Amino acid sequence: MGFLKLIEIENFKSYKGRQIIGPFQRFTAIIGPNGSGKSNLMDAISFVLGEKTSNLRVKTLRDLIHGAPVGKPAANRAFVSMVYSEEGAEDRTFARVIVGGSSEYKINNKVVQLHEYSEELEKLGILIKARNFLVFQGAVESIAMKNPKERTALFEEISRSGELAQEYDKRKKEMVKAEEDTQFNYHRKKNIAAERKEAKQEKEEADRYQRLKDEVVRAQVQLQLFKLYHNEVEIEKLNKELASKNKEIEKDKKRMDKVEDELKEKKKELGKMMREQQQIEKEIKEKDSELNQKRPQYIKAKENTSHKIKKLEAAKKSLQNAQKHYKKRKGDMDELEKEMLSVEKARQEFEERMEEESQSQGRDLTLEENQVKKYHRLKEEASKRAATLAQELEKFNRDQKADQDRLDLEERKKVETEAKIKQKLREIEENQKRIEKLEEYITTSKQSLEEQKKLEGELTEEVEMAKRRIDEINKELNQVMEQLGDARIDRQESSRQQRKAEIMESIKRLYPGSVYGRLIDLCQPTQKKYQIAVTKVLGKNMDAIIVDSEKTGRDCIQYIKEQRGEPETFLPLDYLEVKPTDEKLRELKGAKLVIDVIRYEPPHIKKALQYACGNALVCDNVEDARRIAFGGHQRHKTVALDGTLFQKSGVISGGASDLKAKARRWDEKAVDKLKEKKERLTEELKEQMKAKRKEAELRQVQSQAHGLQMRLKYSQSDLEQTKTRHLALNLQEKSKLESELANFGPRINDIKRIIQSREREMKDLKEKMNQVEDEVFEEFCREIGVRNIREFEEEKVKRQNEIAKKRLEFENQKTRLGIQLDFEKNQLKEDQDKVHMWEQTVKKDENEIEKLKKEEQRHMKIIDETMAQLQDLKNQHLAKKSEVNDKNHEMEEIRKKLGGANKEMTHLQKEVTAIETKLEQKRSDRHNLLQACKMQDIKLPLSKGTMDDISQEEGSSQGEESVSGSQRTSSIYAREALIEIDYGDLCEDLKDAQAEEEIKQEMNTLQQKLNEQQSVLQRIAAPNMKAMEKLESVRDKFQETSDEFEAARKRAKKAKQAFEQIKKERFDRFNACFESVATNIDEIYKALSRNSSAQAFLGPENPEEPYLDGINYNCVAPGKRFRPMDNLSGGEKTVAALALLFAIHSYKPAPFFVLDEIDAALDNTNIGKVANYIKEQSTCNFQAIVISLKEEFYTKAESLIGVYPEQGDCVISKVLTFDLTKYPDANPNPNEQ
């Protein structure tokens, strides 16, 4: 889809110099203060697209140059160019330049003519004349205020049908004038033809006078010969026909006997089939009951399987978690055992090393005995000297040991607390996993419960509805049976009525939708008291068949003739001419229009009912009917409730007893409907009983739902207990332990500080004691070769202390690891027990599922087998039902054949009697003709016999029944039969006449001709001798007039063809636009209103030629009732007008749409809706360029073009562009408005 990319303006209106505006996005808003030149930008777009100067708010093209309106033009030329971009094609430039006082058009910088320019724009969908690309300021309000005629003018402009209006009017005038000329010449020709005829008659009178004299005698002979000839032909024909009919009667008797035997055989076969059908129905009922019992068992088995599968999945998940924990704990224990072995190995290596070192170092500092004694003496002396210091140091040592014990205790407690915290964390993790499992199970259970509840609700509703409906059906059936009992439904239809009903059904099938039915079947008096009156008024039209068109009626008549049906009356709706109902008659007191007391369906048969009823009135009694019929200044057709009819002509008719019999047909029609209703209710009762049998399935579902609800309740209780008790308690204990652990650090640090401080004091005391020892052992140390006595003592003591300390570290590590190993072993055993337990559970569940699946499959197999058997029975039932129907049809056909044969037999017997009567009549006619010829002395040409053989006695009439009279007549007829007449003088054409109507017509013609000849002969006077000259003159004049008439007729035909052509073109243009707009406007109005309940309608006042009259436009605002356009609020009118604007734009849409302040009359809500609609449409249907002053509107755009003024001799417009796509909309969803 193409779009407007850039606009380049130079010295156009308020835009001084050259300015490039753009790029334009799919939805661009032009904003700026009043008077800044926004509308001038729209004028620039209109200008470059070829808009007329008058629509650009200036008088001349020069006034469009910047500064020209104030007398200071910025230049002698100005131009506007547009860059149009299309995907997959090069950009095209369209430019319009003002040079002097005219425009110059360019495409891609090449100068072209205006028509070429327009054609290129039209290829893009831009129609200059229709202005389908822009909406000027105030146009929305203008459209909202338009009346229907003005709306038509708008459509004329958009569709360009208005371009043809002048030519349309011109050709219409030419057509009317040509038709008037033709009519004038026709009347002139007619008058001259009458003159010619008169002159011709005068001439012929003279010729005819003599000719008639000769022809009168010949005509008399011809007439009598004609009568006698055809009398003899008819007698011969009747004799042959009589013999043929007697043969047909014999054949018919034999055929009837054969058909009756066949009918008896078919009845036996039908009885057998119906018994078989009833047996199948019984088996179907039993299988259906069996299926209803088996289905809940299958549902229960399936539910058990599903529940057990869910439990298995949960158990498998728990097994995986337990195995995971077991594997992790096993790994931790393996690590601890490895660490224990490593510590033990390190301890052994240390002991071995110490043993080796003690052996190598033990011999270095060995003292002699005297040196040992001296060492002990000096040691005792040093102790005495430092006794005070030793006591003080001993006290420090005791305190230090006590604090060291405290420190060890705190550190041990810290380690234990850390172990307890780890244990609590594991317990918390276990609690959380249990909660997750419970929540998952509860969610699954809730879903299952919802499904069960939903199924329970559906089944409950279905069963309850079935129960209610069964009660209703039983009540209705009781009522129907009572009504049928009252109506004595055992009435038997005559074969004639059956035949008519069959033909009616046949033509309905042949012409579905075109044949509606008989009038009596399509209407019903509103009350029973009106039945006789309505029957009287409808009369013979009661049985008339209503069809949609004359063609359908003729086709039906042809079909009925082919089927040899009785004559029928047809009322074609397109052919009937009906006078409108006189509304004043509804105001008469004591009377109602007959059409008002009749219900009818479907509605479009009203025309036929109006035709049958007219403006007839129905009154309660005869006096009121007579008063209203004849009492006023104007007569009316009225009927009383007893059937007395008063016609306008003054004729009064009654016939109450016959009318009552006819009126009973309304009740018979009701009985037929009651029978149909009874059959329909019986079938529905069977279906509802099937639905009621689902109660067992409902109870099963309710039981399953209750069990699921109880399990859900226990799970929720367990979840709540786990959350509130176990998890909360563990979290509380963990928090308490963490708090205790946090307190260990400060206490340990305090003890360590005390120990360190005491160590410093002890160090000072030791140094003092060392000084005393150094003084006492000074000489001894030199003797044994050490710096001081402590070096000697520490070699042994220090080593022993280090070894003891190292051994203690090893013991502590082993103790710690042993405790952890014992704990991990206990936990590992618990995890192993859990794994074993879950493995057993999974195995057990899998075995149970296998059993349940087999049980489910067993039930399913039983159901499938039962359903297959049921379907087989149903198929057998359908087949048997089809056979019964076929057999019934065969019997019906045989009955029809029997009825037809019977009817044909009766018909043949009637025909034989009629032929014998006709034969007797023809013989009597021949006797009378011969007798008349003899009496009138008309000489007949005879080939055998003479005129004397004709008897003078009159033939006996049909009323004579005596034997002697009949014998005498037969004797006369036999004697006259011997007379043979020579028909050689009779014209062959007269002999060839076959049909009775044709013979009668020829006879009348001959008689009339004879009468005329005799009459003319008596009246004719001396002929006019100048008649020939007058005839020649009139003939020349007639030829001249005929030529003029023919020329005028051809001119009229040509003018009408020209008019019809322009009329069709104008209608096609207008209708194409109107249909497109009318189709799209409702959808657009809904989209603008953001409400699917909104409705918009367009309708022409004149559908044949819509451009000659107005177009109605109505809208139903969301949440409101239908109101005329004038009663809508201002905002609603504006939205409606916008809907019409966008719908018009959808007809041959331009790629972009320029709109000037269409939101002026909208409130914030409607502004949002319109803006969102434009935003939606701009993404796919068209580019929107909108001038707006309202923030609620232009914030929805993809880009803004800001226009601001600079003051000078006149306003100078400047332009800024702003891309809004970089700033996402705070409300991106337009549907939220």
From Swiss-Prot:
Q: Which domain of life is it from?
A: Eukaryota
Q: Where is the SMC hinge domain?
A: 515-629
Q: Where in the cell is it found?
A: Nucleus; Chromosome; Chromosome, Centromere
Kindly give the SUPFAM superfamilies that the UniProt entry links to this protein. P-loop containing nucleoside triphosphate hydrolases (SSF52540), Smc hinge domain (SSF75553)
Among its keywords, does the record have Phosphoprotein? yes
UniProt xrefs under SMART domains: SMC_hinge
Question: Per UniProt, what is one GO molecular function of this protein?
Answer: ATP binding
One record GO biological process:
cell division
Provide the coiled-coil residue spans.
Answer: 104-124, 163-503, 667-935, 988-1068
Which keywords does this chain's UniProt record carry?
Answer: Acetylation, ATP-binding, Cell cycle, Cell division, Centromere, Chromosome, Coiled coil, DNA damage, DNA repair, Meiosis, Mitosis, Nucleotide-binding, Nucleus, Phosphoprotein, Ubl conjugation
Query: Where does the record place the region Disordered?
Result: 284-308, 348-369, 947-969
Any Pfam family the entry gives: SMC_hinge
UniProt modified residues of type Phosphoserine: S358, S360, S957, S962, S966, S970
Q: Which Gene Ontology terms of cellular component type are present?
A: cohesin complex; cytosol; kinetochore; meiotic cohesin complex; mitotic cohesin complex; mitotic spindle pole; nuclear matrix; nucleoplasm
Provide the tissue specificity: Ubiquitous (at protein level).
Give all cystine bridges in this chain.
none
Q: How does it assemble?
A: Forms a heterodimer with SMC3 in cohesin complexes. Cohesin complexes are composed of the SMC1 (SMC1A or SMC1B) and SMC3 heterodimer attached via their SMC hinge domain, RAD21 which link them, and one STAG protein (STAG1, STAG2 or STAG3), which interacts with RAD21. In germ cell cohesin complexes, SMC1A is mutually exclusive with SMC1B. Interacts with STAG3. Found in a complex with CDCA5, SMC3 and RAD21, PDS5A/SCC-112 and PDS5B/APRIN. Found in a complex containing POLE and SMC3. Interacts with BRCA1, SYCP2, NDC80, RPGR and BRAT1.
Describe the function of this protein: Involved in chromosome cohesion during cell cycle and in DNA repair. Involved in DNA repair via its interaction with BRCA1 and its related phosphorylation by ATM, and works as a downstream effector in the ATM/NBS1 branch of S-phase checkpoint. Central component of cohesin complex. The cohesin complex is required for the cohesion of sister chromatids after DNA replication. The cohesin complex apparently forms a large proteinaceous ring within which sister chromatids can be trapped. At anaphase, the complex is cleaved and dissociates from chromatin, allowing sister chromatids to segregate.
- Protein name per Swiss-Prot or TrEMBL: Structural maintenance of chromosomes protein 1A
Organism field: Mus musculus (Mouse)
